[in-house]
Amino acid sequence: MTPVTLPPSGHAAWDDLASWWLSRYKPSTQRTYATYLPRWNRWCAGRGIDPLAARRADVELWLHTVSDSGLSRASIAAHYDAVASIYRLAYEEELVVGNPCARVTRPKIHRELQRREVLTVLEYAAFLTTARSLSPTHHAIAVLGGMMGLRATEMATLTVESFGTVRGYATLIVVGKGDKPARVPVPIPALGAVQAAIDDRTAGPLLRTRSGAGMDRRSVHRYVAGTARAAGITRPIGPHALRRTVGTVGLNQGIPLRDVQRLLRHARPETTLGSHDITGEALERHASHRVAGFLAGWTG
């Protein structure tokens, strides 16, 4: 895989730090952070500021500039997180006297108002039916993401050897965030699709493209997007929408939060709550429906 590089900032010490900082992350995270940090670098360059000499006031003024650019709150927070991360490293390595982000208030995200792409039950049924008709790989991705909640990278890195049986349960060994391995059960409704993707092989990538090559994260995204379009879903759908669907359906069906958290392998329950369709559930279950129905009954 081609290494991710950052455009030079004009300050060699900062560029060396940035390259080292970026190398500490997985390639997918590197690509994301490589789109965030240059915005800070350009802002500093436009004001003749050496990033290693930046102050808290500079970071706060930059955040105001980013906020005025039309980006979403989540994107602004992500930009800040990248900048705050590199300054934590700079401070730990004594490259700066003080961390300019230490007392900066992180941009708030009002998660209850965020729009998250989640499939309805009927949409997922159409997605699954369409995937089954397209190819074994499409079908496997539909169940791995939409029934088991696997991330795109986790699906792409699955191997035939990761499939096995423990105490009578079919399982997959998944390598998650932070390269943490986890053994997850394959539910019976998903088992046939996984076995069809394996196709009696004993080794190699579990998911394959039409050419027979292994898949990467972007391939999984393309397959999910293509399946959604073929199923008549007009809005953009990616693998994480399938993962959110798992969490949303689980919580809406009354499965305990702890169990859904374990299914999604979240470190904190707040992440599980924040990843499902809060807005949709809140609207559907809002108490005003029952109150209004009761009161309307008295009007005849």
Residue ranges and their predicted role:
Residues V96-G98, H110-A126, D179-I188, R201-A203, ...:
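DNA breakage-rejoining catalytic core of tyrosine-based enzymes
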Residues M1-L6, R290-G300:
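C-terminal secondary-structure termini that scaffold catalytic or DNA-interacting sites
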Residues M148, T153, T157-A193:
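Conserved tyrosine-mediated DNA breakage-rejoining catalytic core shared by Y-recombinases
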Residues V118, G178, L264-H289:
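Catalytic-site neighborhood detector that most strongly recognizes the C-terminal catalytic loop/helix
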Residues V143, M147, R243-A267:
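C-terminal catalytic core of tyrosine-transesterase DNA break-rejoin enzymes
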Residues P187-T234:
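Active-site/catalytic core of tyrosine-dependent DNA strand-transfer enzymes
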Residues D15-R31, L37-R115, T130:
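N-terminal core-binding DNA-recognition domain of tyrosine recombinases/integrases
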Residues E112, V121-A152, Y169, G178:
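Basic, Lys/Arg- and aromatic-enriched nucleic-acid-binding interface segment
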